Regions:
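Amphipathic alpha-helical segments within well-ordered protein domains
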Residues: 3, 42-43, 81
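Short, conserved active-site loops that position catalytic residues or coordinate cofactors/metal ions
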Residues: 34-40
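Acidic, PIN/NYN-like endoribonuclease modules and their adjacent C-terminal/linker elements
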Residues: 38, 104-134
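Short, well-structured N-terminal submotif of metal-dependent ribonuclease cores
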Residues: 1-32, 46-56, 133
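Short, hinge-like loop/turn segments at secondary-structure boundaries
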Residues: 48-51, 87-88, 125-129
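Active-site neighborhoods of divalent-metal-dependent phosphate/nucleic-acid chemistry enzymes
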Residues: 69-107
Length: 134
């Protein structure tokens, strides 16, 4: 979702922009972003776009009240390895997200990546919808 937000050419750019804006304004739950996601996203932007785009995203993440960067503890890393081994369709970074979600008892992930769909206990959201609003 963060990559789509930063790439105007991405098919999901407008939707990602709406999700990020809603998070920034407090209309969505605070989005926890693991250090793996930050690393993966910044590296991608640095290599495929421009360094300044990667820096802009980092600054947005740490300054936004709608996002909370979190460090993945060793236990999550170990759980991510197990999830990665068990799920051939799940990238390691996604497995790390799921491990964090399981530890924190978080059900929802904002993502355009349907690799999360088969994971039990994870509900993927791809619109600026607050799952806790009636």
């Amino acid at each position: 979702m963060l990559l789509a937000r930063m790439s105007r050419k991405d098919a999901h750019h407008d939707t990602a922009r709406r999700i990020v804006e809603a998070a920034d304004h407090g209309d969505l739950p605070t989005m926890r972003v693991t250090n793996y996601v930050v690393t993966e996203t910044l590296n991608y932007l640095h290599e495929r776009q421009e360094h300044d785009v990667a820096v802009e995203l980092y600054d947005r993440l740490v300054q936004s009240a709608g996002f909370e960067p979190v460090h993945t503890p060793k236990a999550d890393f170990s759980q991510a390895v197990d999830l990665f081994r068990e799920n051939s369709g799940l990238a390691f970074g996604d497995a790390a997200i799921v491990a964090c979600m399981q530890r924190e008892d978080i059900e929802y992930v904002y993502s355009f990546d349907d690799d999360f769909d088969p994971v039990t206990g994870v509900t993927r959201l791809n619109t600026a919808t607050n799952p806790f609003s009636p």
